[in-house]
């Protein structure tokens, strides 16, 4: 059976890695969509082409497909809301206070070193303190930016909300994550 089926379907098989740089090129060559986010992919579920296929094969009616789309969209939006809310809360309540406390210890240590007159050690501690202070500023700015786009998303609903989550909130979350990870 495989000997017969494989040659018939070889042209649709892709033996590469779907996450590699080869896939977008291959997808375009085959005329396939290459949606990078859930928000970009979900509308395809209720496209005219998909609805026609579902109804023709008796898999779903238009109303059933729309209902599934609405449920998936709502689930995505709720999940992204939870993730963004949690990230802001954790950054404010956990990471920023710990980093600030450490910066305070470094600053006190720097004063002790300065009082002892150890110039060589002072520069190292000063560099550490500068890095921490700059990092705290970056984290604060990132929290504010994430908060702003998260509020923007919360004011919307449906597909518009999903698009803001995918294209504005997620990148803001990535920026905050990078700022915290850098310290």
Give the role of each language-model region.
Residues 1-183:
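Acidic, glycine-enriched catalytic cores built around paired aspartates
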């Amino acid at each position: 059976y495989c000997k017969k089926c494989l040659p018939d379907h070889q042209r649709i098989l892709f033996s590469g890695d779907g996450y590699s740089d080869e896939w977008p090129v291959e997808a375009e060559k085959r005329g396939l969509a290459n949606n990078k986010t859930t928000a970009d992919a979900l509308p395809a579920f209720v496209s005219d082409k998909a609805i026609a296929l579902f109804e023709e094969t008796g898999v779903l009616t238009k109303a059933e497909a729309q209902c599934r789309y609405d449920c998936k969209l709502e689930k995505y939006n709720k999940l992204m809301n939870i993730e963004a809310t949690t990230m802001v809360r954790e950054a404010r309540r956990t990471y920023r206070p710990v980093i600030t406390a450490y910066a305070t210890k470094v600053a006190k240590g720097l004063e002790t070193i300065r009082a002892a007159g150890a110039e060589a050690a002072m520069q190292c501690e000063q560099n550490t303190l500068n890095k921490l202070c700059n990092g705290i500023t970056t984290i604060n700015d990132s929290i504010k930016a994430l908060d702003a786009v998260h509020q923007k998303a919360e004011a919307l609903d449906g597909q518009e909300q999903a698009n803001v989550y995918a294209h504005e909130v997620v990148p803001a979350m990535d920026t905050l994550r990078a700022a915290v990870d850098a310290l």
